[in-house]
Amino acid sequence: MGDVEKQTEIREKKARNVMRELKIQKLCLNICVGEFGDRLTRAAKVLEQLTGQTPVFSKARYTVRTFGIRRNEKIAVHCTVRGPKAEEILEKGLKVKEYELYKENFSDTGNFGLGVQEHIDLGIK
């Protein structure tokens, strides 16, 4: 066996390694409006249309007078999606970003985050 054949065999063996496969455990979606009211309700509806699940409302941890936020006031909605639905939503999100992410989007532990300005880009009206 030559060196080239040996190297290609090693590459193929690495490619078949189960530990190199990407696995999506969960997808956490979050919309923070910063105030309670109509905008928060609309954000909850958008998240419900996107995931098919009822989102959970998040409360402010402490009062921030400059932003007009009071402690325990509902200011955001979030939802956790798992399984094939998570893969489908992630595919839509990456398509909006044109499958390009920065190195800074990834953490050392294998997580990554991305933001989408308009939910209409995801195919939700």
Swiss-Prot record:
The keyword RNA-binding applies. Keywords: Cytoplasm, Nucleus, Ribonucleoprotein, Ribosomal protein, RNA-binding, rRNA-binding. One of its GO terms (molecular function) is rRNA binding. PROSITE patterns: RIBOSOMAL_L5. It is found in: Nucleus; Cytoplasm. It holds the Pfam family Ribosomal_L5. GO terms for biological process: translation. One of its GO terms (cellular component) is cytoplasm. Belongs to the universal ribosomal protein uL5 family. Component of the large ribosomal subunit. Component of the ribosome, a large ribonucleoprotein complex responsible for the synthesis of proteins in the cell. The small ribosomal subunit (SSU) binds messenger RNAs (mRNAs) and translates the encoded message by selecting cognate aminoacyl-transfer RNA (tRNA) molecules. The large subunit (LSU) contains the ribosomal catalytic site termed the peptidyl transferase center (PTC), which catalyzes the formation of peptide bonds, thereby polymerizing the amino acids delivered by tRNAs into a polypeptide chain. This is Large ribosomal subunit protein uL5. It comes from Toxocara canis.
